[in-house]
Amino acid sequence: MNLSPIILPSNQFDHFYRGGYRIGELRNGPGGPMRPEEWIGSATTRFGEKTMGLSKLPNGEFLRDAIDADPESWFGPEHVSAFGTSTEILVKLLDPDQRLPVHYHPNKAFAKKHLALDHGKTEAWIILEAPADAKVGLGFAQTMKKDVVHDMVKRMDSAALLASLTMVPVKPGDAILVPAGTPHAIEAGIFVLELQEPTDLSALLEWEGFAVDGIKDGHLGLGFDTVLDALRFDPISAAEQKELIKSTGFTSKQSQSLFTSKADGYFRADLLPGDGSKTSAGFSILLMLDGDGILKTTNSGSIAVGHGDALVIPWSAGDWSLNGGVGIVCRPPLPAAAALAP
């Protein structure tokens, strides 16, 4: 059965940090003050929750249930053969009105061993808006020891934890891959489109000033002594940093990949300037950033799209193109690339 692209309703919900007004404005959602994230085209739940985080279709059905009922129409045979009914991707909008806490995410091996999950949480940020002189924390600035970090966590030494990070300047159009295990933080006011593995796995190194009990909920139920084994203690070298960061400035007049090739095993994202260039058939999530256009498919007709629309595009809709407007398309990895990802 050939399915059609679907414009998704907003999927904002409460979180432990402040923000969300820009998401509400872009996506016609509820906005802030404590809804700093929207999960777009999500078949992933919040950690420990049954349905929170799941996207709904306009008819009220969970996207996850629609996929489970007909995975091949949504994904195509190659994806289903490699990944089953997993979307292999989670797409979010992040709009923090306060600095995110220093935190990190486990990799696949740790998640498999300790949580019986098939995915860790390598993620990447596409900077949509940022204040002048905005920065993100990306890895420790020098090699740390587990007991030293654990002591900072026990003492709730937020200043020391933040000072321990390498701070990287960012601007709109930058894209940063954040490998699992990397300690990181995002400053207030940076509006981000995030792609990640389809889990909600975060370990907190600090939580003062946030609406979360880190002693209870900051370690994935494993205890800090265990969860700290998922943390990368050595710094990201200058050479490695170049492999993680790409800057396009959103200026291309042609379709352009936004990430470095290091991201290929986890997810893909392309800027679509509305020039009508073809995107190959496959499960896709499209966020319209500017203007109005027509999304044309080979199998399922056309649909009008506009600023702030978010769509899920099934494989069975066929090849497609965006004619007018500007958007970012987010896609899961190709199976061959995913097989090589650590």
What does each model-identified segment do?
Residues 1-145, 208-247, 269, 335-336:
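Transition-metal
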Residues 91, 100, 117, 123-126, ...:
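His/acidic/aromatic-lined binding-pocket segments of jelly-roll/cupin-type domains
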Residues 94-99, 107, 130-133, 182-201, ...:
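Ligand-binding loop in jelly-roll beta-barrel domains
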Residues 134, 277, 291-296, 310:
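Short beta-strand segments in beta-sandwich/barrel cores
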